[in-house]
Amino acid sequence: MGDTWAQLPWPGPPHPAMLLISLLLAAGLMHSDAGTSCPVLCTCRNQVVDCSSQRLFSVPPDLPMDTRNLSLAHNRITAVPPGYLTCYMELQVLDLHNNSLMELPRGLFLHAKRLAHLDLSYNNFSHVPADMFQEAHGLVHIDLSHNPWLRRVHPQAFQGLMQLRDLDLSYGGLAFLSLEALEGLPGLVTLQIGGNPWVCGCTMEPLLKWLRNRIQRCTADSQLAECRGPPEVEGAPLFSLTEESFKACHLTLTLDDYLFIAFVGFVVSIASVATNFLLGITANCCHRWSKASEEEEI
């Protein structure tokens, strides 16, 4: 028996082709275990998931866990469920443009620490709340352009986005933008605000002054930003306004003005006293005349 085992040939080293196939199968199994099944109607390749232009009414479930670039553009998506991005911590690019979104759930980006590019253009957002980008500290680019119903941006909407470089708010319905919304963005390089119905009243002056100091490196579409009101500046380029344009917002009174106001107040007071005095005399005379008439009748 021992001689028989001694005479059996030992297998040689594995063939390179077989080794390669084994490695590929193992990698495939690992890839499958990581959750890389591609959703229906989507294409998945090199950590890019493309579900664009598929007439989707809702976001696809169960994306590959290692997704870095997700495109859901050109669909009919009306909502993103809370926690949708919880498992996709490698996500860097999220494209949701040209859908029917009106809002995003609170805390959507809580686990998307690597998210850098977010496209929300061509949707139906009416406002940007304070917690819309909560915990999305890695954002570099935000596109909110072409949201025609966008009327309000909360002063703290972009709070904590220290890495933000590009912000597009063009072609919306903004008439006013708080300076506070932009002051906390030290890295901002490109700001697009053209195509909005800006009301260039006194409340616009702080923002305009801030933008004018940064216009060379911050505002990309300064020629497209125009005033829709008040009537005296309607149609004027926003950045053509000067300090003289807001002169009425800073009226200062001279000593002569104060003296004139005091004089007018004094005259009004005297006139009021005199009027009350005359009314009192008239009432007293009427009372006496009425009493005298009653005595004559008796």
From Swiss-Prot:
Cellular component terms (Gene Ontology): plasma membrane; voltage-gated potassium channel complex
GO biological processes: positive regulation of voltage-gated potassium channel activity; potassium ion transmembrane transport
Species per Swiss-Prot/TrEMBL record: Homo sapiens
InterPro entries, A to Z: Cys-rich_flank_reg_C, KCNMA1_auxiliary, Leu-rich_rpt, Leu-rich_rpt_typical-subtyp, LRR_dom_sf, LRRNT
Domain commentary: The transmembrane domain is necessary for interaction with KCNMA1.
Matches recorded under SUPFAM superfamilies: L domain-like (SSF52058)
Assembly and oligomerization: Interacts with KCNMA1.
Keyword hit for Nucleus: no
Subcellular location: Cell membrane
Membrane topology: Single-pass membrane protein
Signal peptide region: 1-34
Protein name: Leucine-rich repeat-containing protein 55
Predominant location: membrane
Residue spans crossing the bilayer: 259-279
